[in-house]
Design a protein with these regions (language model features):
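Thiamine diphosphate
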Residues: 1-128
Length: 128
């Protein structure tokens, strides 16, 4: 699991994303810490919020589950990559349930294909 303190030590000071049960311990850490944090209604919105924070000098992190990757492809390719704005993506990996199987097989390859490299895929027992 990703530890909030490591990200804070790395200069990350703003967090946004869509709640995910697999990332619950990480999200709970964010909420309990009191750092700047906005819960987004969808993954694309979270990217937009993070870009806004980056534009005012806040190193940002977006959390989501990999089933939401489809919602961030356009914001990444039309906003983040062309303008060299790369918030960290913390992605909960889901891959066993039918509705998560396809994205669970291609999540890493999809991000590599579009050239986005600032991400962590969190695999584990909680991310079924």
């Amino acid at each position: 699991m990703v530890k909030l303190q490591k990200l804070l030590d790395g200069g990350y000071e703003f967090f946004t994303g869509v709640p995910d049960s697999g990332l619950k311990p990480f999200i709970d850490e964010i909420i309990e810490s009191g750092v700047k944090h906005i819960i987004a209604t969808n993954e694309g919105q979270a990217i937009g919020i993070a870009v806004g924070a980056e534009l005012v000098g806040k190193k940002s992190c977006v959390y989501l589950q990999n089933s939401g990757l489809g919602n961030i492809i356009n914001p990444l390719t039309s906003l983040c990559i062309p303008y060299d704005i790369h918030p960290l993506l913390v992605i909960g990996h889901r891959h066993t349930l039918l509705q998560h199987k396809i994205m669970g097989e291609v999540d890493d390859d999809l991000l590599k294909l579009i050239g986005y490299t600032n991400y962590i895929i969190v695999r584990g027992d909680n991310n079924v």
